[in-house]
Amino acid sequence: MPGNTFGQVFRLTTWGESHGPAVGCVVDGCPAGIEISEAFIQRELDRRRVGQSRVTSARQEPDQVQILSGVFEGRSTGAPISMLVFNTDAKPGHYDTIKHLYRPGHADYTWDAKYGFRDWRGGGRSSARETIGRVAGGAIAKLLLARYGISVIAWTSQLGDLKAEVIDESEIERNIMRCPDARVAALMVERVEQARRSLDSLGGVVEVRARGVPPGLGEPVFDKLQADIGKAMFSIPAIKGVEFGEGFGVAYMTGSTHNDPFVRRDDGTIGTASNHHGGILGGISTGEEIVLRIAAKPPASIARPQHTVDRAGNPAAIEIHGRHDPTVLPRLVPIAEAMLALVLADHLLRQRLARVDA
């Protein structure tokens, strides 16, 4: 099975299945000498962890990370960094009655069509539990980026038709929706609980930003920065849309309103007076804040009766019980941050190979 490794210089490989013994990752290409805080990696995993609130899955997993290689005396050695998280609360028995049925909205049918065989225990490799490796690897990327003054942040900006109206970043980790608008966050929690009671689920939007990114990152033509970021985001389970800057709003704009005038800043650097472009022009970073939004579909595992077929094509009814997220948004926030950090770390190191004075 190819496609388990992401990046060219700073590379992440993830492994493991939802109900297997463990999941994990290997980070290769991390320069030696980077301070690696296991506590920071654990905090990032805790933000992604199931069972953290009433708007997430009830599965109880400590997600305790173990660093197996590549770190000595708190610093990266330059060798591959391998990290492991054991699955301690897997309950494959929840899937016994539906293992021969194709769950609507899931990858069951497509994996069968591709491989002719699949791990039916919670989706196996296609489960979002695979993203543990992404968040752990993304934490390493964040530690590398921090040395260059680059930071990444994300938040829940929309749930259904509820949209954040105020952006107060200090509120993001103060509420279980990770929404920067405290008033709207409370409404979102109520909406999620309504959906859960109705045996349904909800989708929404997460906004992701990167700050301190220097101009010049990105590789034309096919490895444009937004192309690699787009691939990274679309590789996350449940993501159905990605937009940068004004996104699809550009369809309603003119060139004169969308163009961002270039200016000379007080410190002598060149920037733009506005940021409709979202920090990337021609596939290369401009030095402005990188701004993107990702749309997540409602989780497919719902307890409502649904129509489907079994592997033989026979009609069947299915109800998916067990422990599932009514919305992916709060746990998507750290995953999206991780993927953006991985792309930026990779392109930062690639840029250092592109010119001798980089």
Swiss-Prot record:
Superkingdom of this protein's organism: Bacteria
Gene Ontology molecular function, alphabetical: chorismate synthase activity; FMN binding
Transmembrane region(s): none
Residues noted as binding NADP(+) in the record, renumbered to the chain: R48, R54
Cofactor(s) named in the record: FMNH2
E.C. number: 4.2.3.5
Cofactor binding description: Reduced FMN (FMNH(2)).
GO CC annotation: cytosol
Gene Ontology biological process terms, A to Z: amino acid biosynthetic process; aromatic amino acid family biosynthetic process; chorismate biosynthetic process
Keyword terms: Amino-acid biosynthesis, Aromatic amino acid biosynthesis, FAD, Flavoprotein, FMN, Lyase, NADP
Biological or metabolic pathway of the protein: Metabolic intermediate biosynthesis; chorismate biosynthesis; chorismate from D-erythrose 4-phosphate and phosphoenolpyruvate: step 7/7
Stored Pfam families: Chorismate_synt
Binding sites annotated in the UniProt record for FMN: R125, S126, S127, G282, K297, P298, P299, A300, S301, R323
Catalysed conversion reaction: 5-O-(1-carboxyvinyl)-3-phosphoshikimate = chorismate + phosphate
SUPFAM superfamilies the UniProt entry points to: Chorismate synthase, AroC
Family: Belongs to the chorismate synthase family.
Subunit structure as annotated in this protein's UniProt entry: Homotetramer.
Function description: This reaction introduces a second double bond into the aromatic ring system.
HAMAP family in the record: Chorismate_synth
Name of the molecule in the record: Chorismate synthase
Gene label: aroC
